[in-house]
């Protein structure tokens, strides 16, 4: 590539990566309109990368017949949308939307149940490519991460902006999906930038423009401002970030506590958090939505066992364990219940997760009908100290040994090769876990 012209307003082409020598609308070399230009383009080094409609993009990659069709990843009329391709989104389909509403908005959509094993595998391929660019990669989920390119220009021989654009092209060519990237000076604004112009987006928010850019945006753009807190701010007459910019830190903290300090800082584009490559997931869980609401403890216990095994499998695959078991229930009128129990030591065993879940579940089965059941673990750590041998509880030790034998058989012959008495014959009235993906 030609040596860069010292004028970031000219920018470079995102398709052929050629630096531009004038402010043309199309690339001087290949004619592409996808030009990256910004006064701070070559000074910024903090990026957020987000795969575009990740689950749906993988399914379309693997089945070209789906390319021009609206696609929803989800399952069952009583479930929710995990994600939807951009064609379906144009028709009004959104993540977390109930499936029946999604199909009302887009009745011609193709619906595919989520295949998490495949998505995790592709996510790891993308992550591995990120880690060749910089050691400072902080995953947020299987399809997005922060990257800090500070100090890498000598390594790559190019400014971070160009490395980022080259990465996007490489993912598209080598993995067959697209990504959108945001480049800024802090995490908060890099994340916002990556949401612009999806799919295949590349957006830049510089430090000089940050306050003015944020002023007109709704307060919901600030992390932590959800529906409930937004309602509180609206009652106080605060709707835009610009209104927050006129307020004193002390006033905001008196009104909203610790959150007031966040409102003050982020409204001014102040975010000093560093990219942390050691940032870990905070929990591992699985849940399912029933076709028919269930009140029976026996039926719920049967489903709980299968979910516990899914959580256990993910923990073992990741080499981690959790100390707190969390039960999640949603009633037929959509009220959410969460209960938790802390264990004496971390676990990755399905049996221990299941037993703790059953104890929590018994206290909730009072005739109430449930439409959703979930189980998970939090307080995660490496699994080297998980599940020490219980010399007192012989049965517990035997169950752990049996679980190890079952795992070995499933690794060799597949997950359905061995079923427990709890899970045998299940699956006719429940959908698999449906994790959400933006």
Swiss-Prot record:
It is found in: Cytoplasm. Binds 2 magnesium ions per subunit. Mg(2+) binds at residues 50, 143. It is an enzyme of class 2 (transferase). HAMAP family: DNApol_IV. Monomer. Its cofactor is Mg(2+). Poorly processive, error-prone DNA polymerase involved in untargeted mutagenesis. Copies undamaged DNA at stalled replication forks, which arise in vivo from mismatched or misaligned primer ends. These misaligned primers can be extended by PolIV. Exhibits no 3'-5' exonuclease (proofreading) activity. May be involved in translesional synthesis, in conjunction with the beta clamp from PolIII. GO terms for molecular function: damaged DNA binding; DNA-directed DNA polymerase activity; magnesium ion binding. NCBIfam families: PRK02406.1, PRK02794.1. This is DNA polymerase IV 1. PROSITE patterns: UMUC. Pfam families: IMS, IMS_C, IMS_HHH_1. It comes from the Bacteria. InterPro entries: DNA/RNA_pol_sf, DNA_pol_Y-fam_lit_finger_sf, DNA_pol_Y-fam_little_finger, DNA_polymerase-Y, DNApol_IV, IMS_HHH_1, Rev_trsase/Diguanyl_cyclase, UmuC. Its EC number is 2.7.7.7. It comes from Mesorhizobium japonicum (strain LMG 29417 / CECT 9101 / MAFF 303099). Its main location: cytoplasm. It catalyses: DNA(n) + a 2'-deoxyribonucleoside 5'-triphosphate = DNA(n+1) + diphosphate. Belongs to the DNA polymerase type-Y family. Keywords: Cytoplasm, DNA damage, DNA repair, DNA replication, DNA-binding, DNA-directed DNA polymerase, Magnesium, Metal-binding, Mutator protein, Nucleotidyltransferase, Transferase. GO terms for cellular component: cytosol. The keyword DNA repair applies. GO terms for biological process: DNA-templated DNA replication; error-prone translesion synthesis; SOS response. Residues 46-226 form the UmuC domain.
């Amino acid at each position: 590539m030609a040596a860069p012209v010292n004028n970031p307003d000219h920018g470079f082409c995102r398709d052929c990566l050629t630096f531009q020598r004038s402010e043309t609308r199309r690339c001087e070399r290949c004619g592409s309109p996808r030009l990256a230009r910004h006064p701070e383009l070559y000074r910024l080094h903090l990026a957020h990368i987000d795969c575009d409609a990740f689950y749906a993009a993988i399914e379309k990659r693997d089945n070209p017949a789906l390319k021009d069709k609206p696609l929803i990843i989800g399952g069952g009329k009583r479930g929710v949308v995990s994600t939807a391709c951009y064609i379906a989104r144009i028709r009004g389909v959104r993540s977390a939307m109930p499936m029946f509403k999604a199909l009302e908005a887009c009745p011609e959509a193709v619906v595919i149940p989520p295949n998490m094993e495949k998505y995790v595998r592709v996510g790891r391929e993308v992550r591995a490519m990120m880690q060749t660019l910089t050691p400072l990669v902080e995953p947020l989920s299987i399809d997005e991460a922060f990257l800090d390119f500070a100090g890498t220009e000598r390594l790559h021989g190019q400014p971070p902006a160009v490395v980022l654009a080259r990465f996007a092209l490489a993912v598209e060519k080598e993995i067959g999906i697209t990504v959108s990237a945001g480049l800024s000076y802090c995490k908060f604004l890099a994340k916002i930038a990556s949401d612009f112009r999806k799919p295949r987006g590349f957006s830049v928010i510089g430090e000089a423009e940050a306050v003015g850019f944020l002023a007109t945006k709704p307060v919901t753009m600030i992390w932590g401002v959800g529906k409930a807190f937004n309602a509180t701010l609206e009652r106080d007459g605060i709707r835009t970030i610009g209104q927050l910019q006129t307020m004193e830190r002390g006033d905001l903290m008196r009104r909203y506590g610790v959150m007031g300090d966040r409102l003050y800082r982020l409204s001014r584009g102040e975010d000093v958090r560093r990219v942390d490559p050691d940032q870990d997931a905070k929990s591992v869980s699985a849940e399912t939505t029933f076709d028919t609401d269930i009140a029976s403890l026996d039926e719920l216990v049967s489903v709980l066992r299968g979910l516990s095994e899914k959580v256990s499998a993910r923990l073992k695959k990741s080499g981690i364990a959790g100390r707190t078991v969390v039960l999640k229930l949603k009633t037929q009128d959509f009220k959410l219940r969460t209960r938790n129990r802390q264990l004496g030591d971390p676990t990755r065993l399905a049996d221990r997760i299941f037993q703790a879940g059953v104890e929590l579940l018994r206290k909730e089965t009072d005739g109430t009908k449930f439409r959703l059941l979930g189980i998970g673990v939090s307080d995660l750590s490496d699994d080297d100290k998980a599940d020490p041998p219980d010399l007192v509880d012989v049965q517990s030790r035997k169950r752990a040994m049996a679980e190890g034998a079952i795992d070995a058989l499933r690794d060799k012959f597949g997950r359905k090769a061995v079923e427990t008495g709890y899970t045998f014959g299940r699956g006719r009235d429940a959908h698999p876990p449906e994790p959400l993906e933006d």
